[in-house]
Amino acid sequence: MSGELPPNINIKEPRWDQSTFIGRAKHFFTVTDPRNILLTNEQLEAARKVVHDYRQGIIPSGLTENELWRAKYIYDSAFHPDTGEKMILIGRMSAQVPMNMTITGCMMTFYRTTPAVLFWQWINQSFNAVVNYTNRSGDAPLTVNELGTAYVSATTGAVATALGLNALTKHVSPLIGRFVPFAAVAAANCINIPLMRQRELKVGIPVTDENGNRLGESANAAKQAITQVVVSRILMAAPGMAIPPFIMNTLEKKAFLKRFPWMSAPVQVGIVGFCLVFATPLCCALFPQKSSMSVTSLEAELQARIRETYPELRRVYFNKGL
């Protein structure tokens, strides 16, 4: 065993302090790094071996702390945290930026006709379903019925919103019409995420004290967690869907895009991608992954149980999800 690296680094937790926005942002910039999708199977397996060996107390000679953390984040980017299975490539967090920039750019380029709206909103919700399935809980996996209901409902909601707003904006400024895809995505998130996590709203999510001791399950905590996720997902989409319309509205009046109109989609995809590189990790970092709420905000029955065992406890903690 090498003396260069201590055996007690907690690689189950993020490298940076998650109680601060900066710490959370650094963590998510690493988690969503698109370069991770280019890693080979050999590189992924090598990272998994480093992580598994370190957890068993086996430290390869010459391994540095930076190399250990790099292996940990490569491992986390490709393998499911509960099952340890390798995740579908497009469902990984590192695929979020390239996949979303392509889909969002196309949604915002081809939004004027009904077939285009139907196709791109369907593609977007299909991608969301893959992401939700890939990142499902290993302890309480989604059933096919739950996944199907959320998928169909979100797709229907997104298409209905987009088509309805397209009809309303036919006689207004073209710039306003460019914001229709964003409204559709926001509506879909408000439908998709609660439906995808409906079991949590029924039976609750685990709540703990600050030391991780489980206190029970709370549906009120689930409501707060899901609300935070919906807000962060909508804000995550906002820069990539709110900034490009202004830029494209100006560019399409210029000689270049008038001469080469086919360049409109690639230019828009590039602008969206630039926005998402920053918006995705920064909006994931808005709320702590380990969220908290006051004991007085819990269900009366759970409050009573907690007061019997931990009369001095004021706050409980829970995993909000992504």
From Swiss-Prot:
It is found in: Mitochondrion inner membrane. GO terms for biological process: L-alanine transport; L-serine transport; one-carbon metabolic process; serine import into mitochondrion. It is a multi-pass membrane protein. The chain crosses the membrane at residues 103-120, 147-167, 175-195, 229-249, 267-287. The keyword Transmembrane helix applies. The keyword Mitochondrion applies. GO terms for cellular component: mitochondrial inner membrane. The modification N-acetylserine is found at S2. Residues 2-102, 168-174, 250-266 are mitochondrial matrix. It comes from the Eukaryota. Keywords: Acetylation, Amino-acid transport, Membrane, Mitochondrion, Mitochondrion inner membrane, One-carbon metabolism, Transmembrane, Transmembrane helix, Transport. It catalyses: L-serine(in) = L-serine(out); L-alanine(in) = L-alanine(out); L-cysteine(in) = L-cysteine(out). Amino acid transporter importing serine, an essential substrate of the mitochondrial branch of the one-carbon pathway, into mitochondria. Mitochondrial serine is then converted to glycine and formate, which exits to the cytosol where it is used to generate the charged folates that serve as one-carbon donors. May also transport other amino acids including alanine and cysteine. Belongs to the sideroflexin family. NCBIfam families: mtc (TIGR00798). This is Sideroflexin-1. It comes from Bos taurus. The gene is SFXN1.
